[in-house]
């Protein structure tokens, strides 16, 4: 006799996605790419156009879950921001797609926010791009590299985010240690998309977080990028998480690491003037009520 039916575990991130408003930010060959949007409650919203946190899920450009950063979105909406989870093309859902398409979609996403800033009630000069792994490369490339635009984009509108937060990002695409080398259509594009080659002064402020035991995307790629970028007088905060592997920051993997990285982001956003300090920070539950 079979045992009792087991209720499948709830994917909390996917459940949180249902609390967002869905819009279409881009259509490619008849396929719509959605963005999920969270707004702050009226008592949490600032009396001026809001800052935006735009999230791009982790991937190796083959697959990924758009709901991954939904917990982050809910939190930062509670801090007075408009938050968004953007879809972008990966090969599992869009055959033939790869890193170049992801890069183009990230640029399109930032432009979409700027071009619709009035309707969205947001500040087009306070857009933070956030991404992990291949999604981190996509949004970082919008901040660092020229080109890689979608032919349908209005290129007069800047795709450069005003700040960037990266989780175990792919920064190195060209060296022999670079991950996911087989995902590129050719060596020329892999070399052109290498973020090391774009390092110069004038980058938007960045926060990079990476686990030292990452066996998927090498830790040294982020560490070396942060060091070289800082030498160009850019703001490039780097936090290493000793003994942590790939994806250590995810809500469903480790709440402790999720919370630690979330607070690092919060402090970074406050430092940049994108949100106000949390008046309840450091208070116990009863004190914060």
Feature names for model-found ranges:
Residues 173, 213-217:
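Acidic catalytic loop of the alpha/beta-hydrolase fold
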Residues 1-48:
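N-terminal cap/lid segment of alpha/beta-hydrolase-fold proteins
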Residues 56-59, 113, 210:
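The conserved beta1-alpha1 loop
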Residues 64-73, 84-124, 252-259:
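Catalytic nucleophile-loop/oxyanion-hole region of alpha/beta-hydrolase
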Residues 44-50, 56-96, 137, 215-216:
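Short substrate-entry loop that stabilizes the transition state in hydrolases
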